[in-house]
């Protein structure tokens, strides 16, 4: 009832918005005949006219009707494709900084050309964001003729490109790329050492395809650029050996710390806890292996790292499964995206988990990496002046889009009514019964020439069903992370009669399934004119045969954690008014039901006494499934919200550091900054030492003289000054010391040269800033990991985190000033003068991406230098 009530409210609001926007669609339609009469040249001249009008003070909304009419007419001439009214409606929504929910097959790619063109007129750039490189290349290639016809430039941003090519891509009016690459480029731009290396310009307008996958599903995983840390591979291998001897606590033991097992598993939060018995056992094993001293415990400060390794090893063995969470290929652990089923080469889990899994699978254990720069997608996309997004499934997440990103969700009606039949779920007691029912359904579809798409949640499940089909001699295609290269080809032909396609997490695949198979792909393989008509006739027969059979049939092998992912799978059928059907098969052994469904429901089903292979359709069970999904959705939303709350603290500090960095890089002369810092640092040090019992406390005076000599190369005798003038004030002493320091520094400047000293100042300032920021991020990680313990002291962990991180950040900024002045004060003039011919930037320090780099490999920053001579030198 509550959901229906919400839907009613949302629908009414949605209808009001659509009614308002439909008036704009009408005004665009009225311009259609006028624009059809324009010559190509006149139509193309509109771009220049629109830009001139913007310069004269008009806004984008003023230009929207004419600009959209221009794009529609240009598309008709270039592609022979006219934007439908619903696509125009979608374009208006996207320009209004909203999320447009458009069903699969409604032409989101063509819709995106409308707001992309309009916002590109400002000259500040448009970033079109896709889920993967294939989609970025495909969409850029497909839409470039249209944009170039209208006088706009189009760029493509790919991972393997040099920073010069990336810079060219970002300077284009419209740039295509993936969310990962845009985010990493932002981080890399804040690790450069000269303005010429910066690739991005201002973040103006981001148009995000599959926006729910990017802003919600991937929001829990931050982008991280990291560098190599100390070698601890031996420890991972040793700890891995003790895991088989530890026993997992039985589920019925409610007390996770005092049960009979050695450790307990919380599957909901993916965490593992050692029991008291487990703690004793682990300590005994570590003592036997001489990894821990006798007088120490596992929880002592010296052994925190050991405890971390033990928990990581237990998580690797009990919470992460081969061919579900990761693949083992070429002596590497390759992560599988839990939302899309795609592999993510080069990406590594943090906190030692990746190394623990490497030890578990007996592949080479690579060094841990230290975070050098990181940002979440939530905070990255909030940097844009304007963002919008498209997806086939957004309504269920409308609250999150609104509360976190300030984005309203608008449901765009389909161009043709949706006639797909969504059949009720069938629930079985066991996994085996469920699989038998699925196989029976597949055989029935084949008998009536109906194509079938079977959606699974893991590679393991897809391969298991594939084996069953092979035994039955049923031809089929498997689409999962292992066969990524054939993805587009498999999907293109998934609508052929009798075709059976098994797909792991269909979300974000980006290719429509056409009933009868893809005509375009068949024509591409046969370009002979005499064969084209035959191919078209054969395709028409196949298309009609599939329509007659009921269209594409979707089989869900189990419910996903999110209803939205289920809807994405269903949405593969019934595109553009096509016929189709869908059904989900479930069992009480499914992970969703096992972890989140209540014990009462499971007990009730057992008492029903179902016979073998008998399914149940009961309101209670249906309600239990919905409640289970809501539990997971709410939990995941809380995790994302908490991640954002913590990252917001770091984000404010990140903004300060990056703003300071960019200001430094863009400045040719920071002499005044150095003098100001010099004054602040010396004033603070002198005041601290001379604050107590001056001038009687000779010990403090001696300490000050030593510090000034050692840290700042200032050989000053304050005692002599006091002998000459007994009444000298502290303020006068401070002024005299600062004046001497400035004079000494000015002498260095004269000897080294004005231009050279400016280069040195800039280089030292940047290197010191990066070094301290790296250490600060590491300290923040440690603080974050243990801050929850403050709750036991009746303190709010979030407030404690904010307070401590602020203090840490303030201390870091003070230390930055101190180290810069100390370093500059101790410059070896003779050494510098003899090495002025060397490029100062050779010692610049940035580090590699999540992909671990060798010392002699080309540097991560794409400068062309070896890593050890560029970003790896810090």
Curated annotation (Swiss-Prot):
PROSITE patterns for this protein: SECA (PS01312), SECA_MOTOR_DEAD (PS51196)
EC number(s) on file: 7.4.2.8
Matching Pfam families: P-loop_SecA, SEC-C, SecA_DEAD, SecA_PP_bind, SecA_SW
Keyword terms of this UniProt record: ATP-binding, Cell inner membrane, Cell membrane, Cytoplasm, Membrane, Metal-binding, Nucleotide-binding, Protein transport, Translocase, Translocation, Transport, Zinc
MF terms in GO: ATP binding; metal ion binding; protein-exporting ATPase activity
Cofactor(s) the record lists: Zn(2+)
Cell compartments where the protein resides: Cell inner membrane; Cytoplasm
A cellular component term, taken from the record's GO annotations: plasma membrane
InterPro entries (alphabetical): Helicase_ATP-bd (IPR014001), Helicase_C-like (IPR001650), P-loop_NTPase (IPR027417), SEC_C_motif (IPR004027), SecA (IPR000185), SecA_CS (IPR020937), SecA_DEAD (IPR011115), SecA_motor_DEAD (IPR014018)
Source superkingdom: Bacteria
GO term, biological process aspect, one: protein import
Enzyme class: translocase
Entries under SUPFAM superfamilies matching the protein: Helical scaffold and wing domains of SecA (SSF81886), P-loop containing nucleoside triphosphate hydrolases (SSF52540), Pre-protein crosslinking domain of SecA (SSF81767)
Cofactor note: May bind 1 zinc ion per subunit.
Binding site for ATP: 87, 105-109, 512
Keyword NADP among UniProt keywords: no
Its membrane topology: Peripheral membrane protein
Positions that bind Zn(2+): 859, 861, 870-871
Catalytic activity annotation: ATP + H2O + cellular proteinSide 1 = ADP + phosphate + cellular proteinSide 2
Functional description taken from the UniProt entry: Part of the Sec protein translocase complex. Interacts with the SecYEG preprotein conducting channel. Has a central role in coupling the hydrolysis of ATP to the transfer of proteins into and across the cell membrane, serving both as a receptor for the preprotein-SecB complex and as an ATP-driven molecular motor driving the stepwise translocation of polypeptide chains across the membrane.
UniProt similarity note: Belongs to the SecA family.
Subunit structure: Monomer and homodimer. Part of the essential Sec protein translocation apparatus which comprises SecA, SecYEG and auxiliary proteins SecDF-YajC and YidC.
Name the UniProt record assigns to this protein: Protein translocase subunit SecA
Species whose genome carries this gene: Buchnera aphidicola subsp. Schizaphis graminum (strain Sg)
Lineage: Bacteria, Pseudomonadati, Pseudomonadota, Gammaproteobacteria, Enterobacterales
């Amino acid at each position: 009832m509550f959901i229906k009530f919400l839907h009613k409210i949302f629908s009414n609001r949605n209808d009001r918005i659509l009614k308002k926007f439909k008036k704009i669609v009408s005004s665009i339609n009225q311009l259609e005949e006028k624009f059809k009469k324009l010559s190509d040249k006149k139509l193309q001249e509109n771009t220049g006219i629109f830009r001139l009008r913007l310069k004269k003070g008009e806004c984008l909304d003023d230009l929207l009707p004419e600009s959209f009419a221009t794009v529609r007419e240009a598309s008709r001439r270039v592609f022979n494709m006219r934007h439908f009214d619903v696509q125009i409606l979608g374009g208006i929504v996207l320009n209004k900084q909203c999320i447009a929910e458009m069903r699969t097959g409604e032409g989101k790619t063509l819709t995106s050309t409308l707001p992309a063109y309009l916002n590109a007129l400002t000259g500040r750039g448009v970033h079109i964001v896709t889920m993967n490189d294939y989609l970025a290349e495909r969409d850029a290639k497909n839409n470039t003729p249209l944009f170039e016809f209208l006088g706009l430039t189009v760029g493509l941003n790919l991972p393997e490109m040099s920073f010069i090519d990336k810079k060219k891509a970002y300077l284009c009016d419209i740039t295509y790329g993936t969310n990962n690459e845009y985010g990493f480029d932002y981080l890399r731009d804040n690790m450069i050492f000269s303005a010429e290396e910066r690739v991005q310009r201002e973040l103006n307008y981001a148009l995000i395809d599959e926006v729910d996958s990017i802003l919600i599903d991937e929001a829990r995983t931050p982008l991280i650029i990291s560098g190599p840390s100390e070698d601890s591979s031996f420890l991972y291998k040793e700890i891995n050996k003790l895991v088989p001897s530890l026993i997992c606590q039985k589920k019925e033991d409610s007390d996770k710390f005092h049960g009979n097992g050695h450790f307990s598993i919380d599957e909901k939060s993916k965490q593992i806890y050692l029991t008291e018995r487990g703690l004793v056992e682990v300590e005994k094993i570590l003592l036997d292996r001489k990894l821990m001293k006798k007088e120490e415990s596992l929880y002592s400060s010296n052994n925190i790292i050991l405890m971390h390794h033990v928990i990581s090893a237990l998580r690797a063995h009990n919470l992460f499964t081969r061919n579900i969470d990761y693949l083992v290929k070429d002596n590497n652990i390759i992560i599988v995206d839990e939302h899309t089923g795609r592999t993510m080469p080069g990406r590594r889990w943090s906190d030692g988990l990746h190394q623990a899994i490497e030890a578990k699978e007996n592949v080479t254990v690579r060094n841990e990496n230290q975070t050098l720069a990181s940002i979440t997608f939530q905070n990255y996309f909030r940097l844009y002046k304007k963002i919008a997004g498209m997806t086939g499934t957004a309504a269920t997440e409308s609250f999150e889009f609104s509360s976190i990103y300030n984005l309203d969700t608008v449901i765009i009606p389909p161009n043709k009514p949706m006639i797909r039949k969504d059949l009720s779920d069938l629930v079985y007691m066991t996994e085996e019964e469920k699989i038998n029912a699925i196989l029976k359904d597949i055989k029935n579809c084949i008998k009536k020439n109906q194509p079938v798409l079977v959606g699974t949640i893991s590679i393991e499940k897809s391969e298991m069903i594939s084996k069953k089909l092979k035994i039955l001699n049923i031809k089929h295609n498997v689409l999962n992370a292992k066969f990524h290269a054939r993805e587009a080809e498999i999907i293109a032909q998934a609508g052929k009669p009798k075709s059976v396609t098994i797909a792991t997490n269909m979300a974000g695949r980006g290719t429509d399934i056409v009933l009868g198979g893809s005509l375009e792909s068949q024509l591409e393989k046969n370009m002979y004119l005499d064969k084209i008509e035959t191919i078209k006739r054969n395709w028409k027969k196949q298309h009609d045969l599939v329509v007659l059979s009921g269209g594409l049939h979707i089989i869900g092998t189990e419910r996903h954690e999110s209803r939205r992912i289920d809807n994405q799978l269903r949405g593969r059928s019934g595109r553009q008014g096509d016929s189709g059907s869908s059904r989900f098969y479930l069992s009480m052994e499914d992970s969703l039901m096992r972890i989140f469904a209540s014990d009462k429901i499971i007990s009730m089903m057992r008492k029903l006494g179902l016979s073998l292979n008998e399914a149940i359709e009961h309101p209670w069970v249906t309600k239990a499934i919905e409640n289970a999904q809501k539990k997971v959705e709410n939990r995941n939303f809380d995790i994302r919200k908490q991640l954002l709350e913590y990252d917001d603290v770091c984000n404010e500090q990140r903004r300060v550091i990056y703003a300071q960095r960019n200001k430094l890089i863009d400045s040719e002369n920071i002499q005044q900054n150095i003098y100001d810092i010099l004054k602040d640092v010396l004033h603070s040090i002198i005041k601290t030492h001379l604050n107590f019992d001056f001038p009687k406390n000779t010990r403090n005076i001696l300490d000050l003289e030593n510090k000034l000599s050692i840290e700042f190369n200032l050989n000053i005798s304050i005692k002599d000054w006091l002998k000459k003038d007994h009444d000298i004030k502290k303020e006068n002493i401070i002024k005299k010391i600062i004046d001497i320091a400035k004079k000494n520094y000015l002498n260095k400047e004269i000897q080294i040269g004005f231009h050279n000293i400016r280069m040195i100042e800039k280089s030292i300032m940047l290197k010191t800033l990066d070094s301290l920021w790296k250490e600060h991020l590491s300290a923040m990680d440690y603080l974050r990991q243990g801050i929850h313990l403050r709750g036991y002291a009746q303190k709010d962990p979030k407030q404690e985190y904010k307070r401590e991180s602020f203090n840490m950040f303030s201390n870091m900024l003070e230390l930055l000033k101190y180290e810069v002045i100390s370093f500059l004060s101790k410059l070896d003039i003779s050494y510098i003068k003899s090495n002025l011919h060397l490029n100062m930037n050779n010692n610049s320090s940035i580090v590699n991406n999540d992909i671990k780099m060798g010392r002699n490999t080309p540097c991560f920053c794409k400068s062309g230098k070896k890593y050890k001579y560029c970003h790896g030198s810090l």
